[in-house]
Each structure stands twice: as structure tokens, then as C-alpha cells.
Amino acid sequence: MKTLLLTLVVVTIVCLDLGYTLTCLICPEKYCQKVHTCRDGENLCVKRFYEGKRFGKKYPRGCAATCPEAKPHEIVECCSTDKCNK
């Protein structure tokens, strides 16, 4: 009986862990509230900052599998918890 109970506990823990999906903010505005569920393999939230020539400051956000390299005059921040790219 103890073996069966232990097996059920282990299976439950494994199944709960497999079902986790990261959520990140996804919008270009400075103050963002739009939440997006990331796809499998996208384990990071990303926030970029740059100043556009025509439309001012931009703050694109989203999900990523790897942290992208910053382009010239750009700041990139990556994190791995839900909605951490504020």
C-alpha cells in the first residue's frame, strides 16, 4: 500500500511539473499589462529598450528560447519567472 501511495505522489509531482508554461508581458508600450502564454521551449521573458528616430522610446516585450544579443543603442533584459519583463 505504501508503495502505491509513493508511486502516485511521484507521478503527480512529475505531471504537475510538465504542465508549467511561462507567461510574459507582450506589448511595445512602457506600461504593459497584456499577458501572453509562451510556447514550449520559450523559457525566457524578454524586454528590449531603444529609442526610435520617428516614434520615440520603444519597449518591445515577449517570450524567447534564448536571450537575444543587444543591437547597438539597445538594452535587452531577460528573466525566467512569470510576467518578470515589466
Curated annotation (Swiss-Prot):
Record's signal peptide: 1-21
CDD domains attached to this UniProt entry: TFP_snake_toxin (cd00206)
Cellular-component GO terms for this entry: extracellular region
Tissue spec. comment: Expressed by the venom gland.
Disulphide bonds in the chain: C24-C45, C27-C32, C38-C63, C67-C78, C79-C84
Keyword Phosphoprotein: no
Pfam families cross-referenced by the UniProt entry: Toxin_cobra-type
Assigned keywords, A-Z: Acetylcholine receptor inhibiting toxin, Disulfide bond, Ion channel impairing toxin, Neurotoxin, Postsynaptic neurotoxin, Secreted, Signal, Toxin
Compartments, record wording: Secreted
GO molecular function: acetylcholine receptor inhibitor activity; ion channel regulator activity; toxin activity
Family under the similarity heading: Belongs to the three-finger toxin family. Ancestral subfamily. Orphan group II sub-subfamily.
Role description: Binds with low affinity to muscular (alpha-1-beta-1-delta-epsilon/CHRNA1-CHRNB1-CHRND-CHRNE) and very low affinity to neuronal (alpha-7/CHRNA7) nicotinic acetylcholine receptor (nAChR).
Protein's UniProt name: Neurotoxin 3FTx-LT
Protein source organism: Bungarus fasciatus
